[in-house]
């Protein structure tokens, strides 16, 4: 039992040190923040495209209804 304690303690110590280094690197990466990744750009552009399509469809529908009203003289 005693012979296993030292190697396990040593491995635990090395694991905690490497984990702390990973957290520091992750924190440094998150501090940049000014850069947008390609996925974020794609997501923003897709959202803008969908909004523009929705607005265009709404405007087109309104224009068509107005023209139909003018042609039928029903308004």
From Swiss-Prot:
GO annotation (BP), single: defense response to Gram-positive bacterium
Subcellular location per the Swiss-Prot or TrEMBL entry: Secreted
InterPro entries per record: Antimicrobial_frog_2, Frog_antimicrobial_propeptide
Residues making up the propeptide: 23-40
Assigned GO CC terms: extracellular region
Keywords attached to this entry: Amphibian defense peptide, Antibiotic, Antimicrobial, Cleavage on pair of basic residues, Cytolysis, Disulfide bond, Fungicide, Hemolysis, Secreted, Signal
Signal peptide start and end residues: 1-22
Disulphide bonds in the chain: 69-75
Summary of the tissues where the protein is detected: Expressed by the skin glands.
Known role: Antimicrobial peptide. Active against some Gram-negative and a variety of Gram-positive bacterial strains. Active against fungus C.glabrata 090902 but not against C.albicans ATCC 10231. Shows hemolytic activity against human erythrocytes.
Family: Belongs to the frog skin active peptide (FSAP) family. Brevinin subfamily.
Protein name: Brevinin-2SN2
Source organism per UniProt: Sylvirana spinulosa
Organism taxonomic ancestry: Eukaryota, Metazoa, Chordata, Craniata, Vertebrata
């Amino acid at each position: 039992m005693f012979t296993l304690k030292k190697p396990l303690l040593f491995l635990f110590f090395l694991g905690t040190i490497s984990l702390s280094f990973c957290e520091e690197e992750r924190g440094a990466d998150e501090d940049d923040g000014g850069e947008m990744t390609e996925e974020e750009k794609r997501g923003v552009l897709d959202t803008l495209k969908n909004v523009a399509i929705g607005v265009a469809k709404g405007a087109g529908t309104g224009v068509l209804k107005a023209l139909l009203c003018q042609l039928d003289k029903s308004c």
